[in-house]
C-alpha cells in the first residue's frame, strides 16, 4: 500500500480512506484483459440499478477509469487528481492550478455518474475545447464501453439529440443553454433534443457562473427599428461636450445629461421635450453618447465584415452571436457608419445562474475559485476545495512596478522584454484589450523583437491553440489579450503535439501533390531536404501510403481533420489510417528527444516570464495570467507593470493613494511599495464586492421570473407529452366561467356585459339575455344554478366542436388542441417577458418613494403572471371554439 500523501492536509485526510481503497484495487485491475475491464463497468451498472446509489461504487469506478486512462492515453491519475475527482463527485468546486490536469480529472466522476445511464454533461467555454476534450478523453470512455457525444453549433436537431443521448456529452455553456430554450419553444415532441438533467461538470466554472452570470441568454425576433433616430442621435454627439452637456459615470458605464445638455439637444432637434412618451428621443441620445464616450473599437468590440462584434472583456475572445440590448448595439453601428440592423424583442431567455441550478447534481473546476468562494456558496450552494499540486510550485511572483503614467509604463515593458529576451527566456505578456496588444507590438518592433500576437482579430484567432502551445519555446515572445479559458497548456520548450501535427500535415500534402503530379523521383529528395526528421523506415511507410488510392482521394482539409482527431482507440479503421498512426509515432520518437533538451534549456533560463500590463477588476483574471507559468513544478516568474492612470487605480484607488503616489513619483522611475500593493488589492476587492452585489441583485430579481419560467416550461412539457388535452380545455373553460361569475357576484361587472363576454367567447347566443318580467334571465338564477347552466353550455359547445373536427380523421382534435395551447402559451409568455422588463425598470424609481423595489417587483410580478394565465385561458378557448380545418 502507498504512503498517504501530506497527512497534515485536511482535504487529503478527508478523502484518504477512499484514496487507499482505489489504490488497493490497482494491482488486481492491471492483470485483467480489456474485455474483463469492460465487464466490470457492466457489473457496476447492474449494482446501481439494484441499489440506486453510487456511494458504494466510487472506489471501483475510479480505479477502472484510472486503469483505462493508463491503457489508452498512457496517463495515470495522480492521487491528488483522484481527490479532485472525489470533490467533483461530491457536488463541489475543485480549484486546480494550471497544468494539473483538470480535463483528465473530470473523467473520474463522469464515468462514475455515467453508470446511472441518465447522462453526464461536461461543459466547456468554447467549441475547440469541447471538441478537443471529447476526442482525447473519449478514448477512456469508449474503452470502458461508454459512448460520448459532442455538440457543435452547426449540428442538426437529430444530431444534437443523438449526442445528448450519449452517456457523456461535451458541450459549450452557450450551446447547452440555447438548446434548453429551443426545447421549450418546440411544438413537436420529436424536436426536443435534451433529456432530463442529471449531472453537470463545468470547466472554467468561475468564467461561466461568475463572469457571465449577468448576461442573459436570449432568443429573439426582429421588430421595427427607427433607423433615422439612431443616425440623427449619433450626429448630435458631435455638438456635445463632456462636463458641459453630459457627465460620464465610468464606474457604472452610464451617462447623465446636464440641464444645458438637454436644452442643447432639444434645440438641435427642434422639439419641446426629449422625454415625450409619444415620441421619446432620450434613449437614442443617451445610447449615442454611450457609444462615443464609453465603448471603443478594438477595446469593447471590433468591426468585422461590416458588423460590430463584441469582445469578451474576460477572455479576449470575440462573441459574434452576442448583441448589446436596449438599442446600444444600433447606436454603435450608427457611430461606425455601418448598416443598422433591426432591434429585437425577447422570445425566451434565461441566465446561467438559473440555468445551471436546474441540475440535480452540479460541480465545477477552475484554477481560481477561492477568491469568489462566498458567491459560489450563497448563490449556487457550491463550496470550493483547493486541490494540492502534484509537485511544489516554484513560480516567483515579483512585486508590482508602478509608473507615473501610461507612456512610462509601456516603454518600460518593451525595454524589459528586450533585456529578458537576450537570454532566450520565453515571455508571455497579458494585455486587457486588442488596442493595447497592437500598441505593444509596435513598441517591440522598435527593438526589432519578433513576437506572436493573440487577440480577438480573426487572423490571430485562427492560430490560437498553436500560439499558446508554443509560448514556452526558447526566445518566444507572445502578446495575448486576457488568458482566461485559452485551454491549451504552455509547455516549456514548446508543445510537440502541435509541431508534429503541422509537420506531418506539410509532409503528407506535399508528398500527395508530388504523386498526383507524377514527380515520384524527386519527392523523396525534396522531403529529406525540407524535413530533417525523415528516416528510411518513415519513407517506406510513406511510400506505401502514397500508393493507397483511398488516401489519394482525400483533400488537404480531410488530412488535417484526421490529424486533429488522432485517436488511439478508433483510428485504425482503414489501412491508410494505420500508416498515418505509424508516421505520428515516428515523429514523436524523433521530436521527444529534442523537446526534452529544449525543456531543460528553458528551465535553466528560469522558465516562462509572465508580464501583466494592468491589474484587472478581478483578482481571478490576474491569477489566471500568473498561473500560465510554473505549471507542474516548472520554474517561472510573474510581474505586473502598472501606472497611476490605469483604470483600477484611477476609478477605485481612492484620493489618498493618488496623492501619495503623486508626491513620491517625480520621474519615470518605477515605485515598489507594500502600501500600494495592498491598496491595489483592496481596490480589486471593492470592485469584486461591487460586482458581486450587482450579480446578487440580478439573481434576486431574476429568481422571481425564474420561478414563473419553471411553471410555464413544466406546463408546456406536460401539454407536449399529453396524448389528449381535453382536461386542460375543460379546466380552462370552467375557470373562465367561474372568474366571470365572481365578478358578477362582487358587482364589478354588469349583467349585460357578462352575457356579451360569454357569447363572444362561446361564439353562440345565450338565452340569458332574454327578458322575463322586465328582468334578464341571468338575474333570476342563483350563483350555483348559473354556474351549472354555463358549464353545460360550454361542454355542449366544446363537444359540438370536437364532433365537427372529428370527421377530418383520427388525432386531428388532439393535435389542434395541443397546437392552439402551445402557440398561445408562447405568445403570452413573450408578452410577459416584455412586461417584466418594463416592470424591472419602473420599480427602481419607487425606491425614491421610500418603497422597497424588490418587494414591489415581487408583488406586481405575481399579479401580472396571474393575469397572463387568465389571458391564456381566454385565448385558447376563443381560438379553439372558432377553429376550422381548411
Task: Enumerate the predicted regions with their spans.
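Conserved P-loop NTPase motor core
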Residues: 1-660, 664, 714
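Extended, charged helical/alpha-beta scaffold domains that provide interaction surfaces
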Residues: 306-309, 315-318, 568, 603-606, ...
